[in-house]
């Protein structure tokens, strides 16, 4: 809805209020209730149909009096997102000293000081003024927050869940403003809840922006290392490469865990006999490890494509090129392990199903013997 439409609705509401007040008392009361409800419902529906960005733009375009009238009718649930969209001048006029907060999200800003990452306090818009970070990490950031931070640094920040296409050109590309976009999956390895988490990266003017919907151990580890070890990173690309390298290491640890679990399963399968209950448990473990192995293989191949994109684009310095090649060698090593684990999983699956078939054949033989023993003599 256009700003002019909101102006028209608010002006009509003001004129109706003036007319209502000029009526006699009895008619005034009836008209006031009916007209007030009608126009309030119309305004509420108009507000409901707008995004936070559209409402912020509308509030900036209205006169102060009209903006105050509209502001009073905006639901509290939308206030914080709209505060991110409004100009600072209009925000001060309507909300006083209230700053847009980062409720439900986590925004971390890091600058490079003496070869170490130093996290800067961030609670609202004013903390971005005069800042030249090397890494901005956003977890579960709203569209309004992404838009404001992106506009502040002159880059568009995507939703990490938007790009799920397998096409390389969709996941790894360079925008017209030289912003480098990469969309990758990182492993979240938790007992009973292991999955891939989409992460969007943007490299722009020496700043790495990372966007995701939940925290990852890989990111916590890299923040700790970069804060404590001088020279661990020298620029935003170093941070990106270290995150990819740490994800490969996390995948390696997960594969070691899969080896240990499958070794235990193998001992059970190689026993002289396996009950149906044991077989069911074994099949469950095997299926879980097969799923995890496939997830790891997919993630490291995704990382491999991202690194190849950076290398082909001549976006790395000579030392960074060596780091990327080392990560690729680690990925090649893991690929052979995932292939071996798939073979081992298939063997254990076939062996377990074989035991189930043996158990079924035993029961069939028993039923056959019982049926012959108790068969009537005249049938024999």
Regions found by a protein language model. Give the residues of each.
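Divalent-cation
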Residues: 93, 97-230, 234
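Solvent-exposed alpha-helical segments within well-ordered globular domains of core cellular machineries
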Residues: 56-60, 72, 80-84, 96, ...
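Membrane-associated alpha-helical segments
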Residues: 206, 247, 253, 257-260, ...
């Amino acid at each position: 809805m256009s700003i002019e439409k909101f102006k028209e609705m608010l002006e009509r509401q003001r004129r109706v209020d003036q007319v209502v007040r000029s009526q006699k008392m009895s008619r005034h009361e009836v008209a006031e209730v009916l007209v007030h409800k009608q126009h309030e419902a119309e305004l509420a529906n108009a507000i409901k149909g707008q995004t936070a960005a559209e409402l912020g733009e509308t509030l900036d375009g209205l006169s102060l009096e009209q903006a105050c009238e509209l502001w009073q009718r905006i639901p509290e649930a939308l206030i914080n997102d709209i505060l991110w969209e409004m100009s600072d001048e209009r925000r001060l006029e309507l909300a006083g000293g209230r700053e847009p907060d980062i409720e439900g999200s986590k925004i971390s800003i890091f600058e490079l000081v003496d070869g170490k990452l130093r996290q800067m306090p961030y609670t609202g818009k004013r903390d971005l003024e005069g800042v030249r970070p090397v890494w901005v990490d956003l977890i579960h950031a709203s569209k309004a927050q992404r838009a404001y931070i992106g506009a502040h640094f002159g880059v568009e920040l995507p939703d990490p869940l938007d790009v799920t296409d397998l096409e390389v050109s969709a996941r790894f590309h360079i925008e017209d403003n030289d912003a480098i976009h990469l969309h990758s999956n990182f492993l979240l390895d938790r007992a009973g809840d292991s999955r891939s988490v989409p992460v969007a990266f943007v490299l722009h003017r020496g700043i790495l922006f990372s966007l995701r919907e939940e925290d990852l151990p890989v990111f916590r580890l890299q923040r700790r290392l970069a804060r404590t070890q001088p020279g661990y990173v020298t620029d935003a690309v170093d941070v990106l490469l270290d995150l990819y390298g740490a994800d490969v290491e996390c995948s390696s640890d997960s594969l070691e865990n899969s080896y240990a679990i499958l070794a235990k399963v193998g001992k059970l399968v190689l026993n002289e006999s396996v009950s149906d209950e044991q077989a069911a448990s074994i099949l469950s473990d095997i299926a879980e490890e097969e799923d995890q192995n496939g997830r790891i293989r997919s993630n490291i191949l995704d990382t491999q494509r991202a690194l190849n994109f950076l290398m082909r684009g001549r976006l790395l310095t000579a030392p960074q090129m060596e780091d990327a090649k080392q990560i690729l060698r680690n990925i090649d090593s893991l690929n052979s392990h995932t292939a071996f684990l798939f073979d081992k999983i298939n063997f254990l699956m076939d062996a377990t199903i074989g035991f189930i078939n043996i158990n079924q054949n035993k029961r069939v033989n028993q039923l056959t013997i019982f049926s012959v023993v108790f068969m009537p003599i005249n049938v024999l």
